[in-house]
């Protein structure tokens, strides 16, 4: 996250983005979505036509499912703070941390719950979580997400 790389207007960004700057890519999408929602007040075919401010832009950001994705997670937290958007903190609530290896496998616990792995700073972590209604991570993430949504609605 480098605030000096974020543009004032989404039109100022050069497309496509590279993976090197998550914050700029998210900033672009956020600004474009908010602008598109705002413009609906002028669209005669929109149900938000004539509504001051257009469609309310509701945005919820999420961290990666575990805490090894430090650059991504830090960037998304800063964007959440900048914009005042709610943040689903999967990395803090998933049930394990990169700071402690699994006591039996002596590997990162995330590898037990992933279909594949990725190497970050020489350490192997789970990359894409197992999918399916009976998979622990999917159920855990769903519970964390639902709890966050309920806290916003109540």
What are these regions (language model features)?
Residues 1-154:
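Alpha-helical cap/lid subdomain in secreted, periplasmic
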């Amino acid at each position: 996250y480098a605030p000096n790389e974020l543009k004032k207007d989404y039109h100022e960004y050069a497309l496509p983005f590279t993976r090197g700057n998550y914050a700029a890519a998210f900033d672009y999408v956020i600004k474009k979505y908010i602008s598109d929602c705002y413009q609906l007040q002028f669209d005669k075919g929109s149900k938000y036509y004539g509504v001051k401010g257009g469609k309310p832009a509701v945005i919820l950001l999420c961290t990666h499912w575990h805490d090894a994705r430090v650059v991504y997670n830090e960037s998304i937290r800063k964007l959440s703070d900048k914009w005042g958007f709610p943040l689903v903190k999967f990395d803090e609530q998933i049930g394990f941390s990169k700071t402690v290896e699994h006591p039996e496998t002596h590997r990162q616990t995330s590898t037990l719950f992933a279909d594949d792995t990725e190497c970050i700073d020489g350490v192997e972590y789970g990359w894409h979580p197992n999918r399916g209604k009976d998979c622990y991570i999917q159920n855990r993430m769903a519970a964390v997400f639902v709890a966050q949504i309920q806290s916003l609605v109540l």
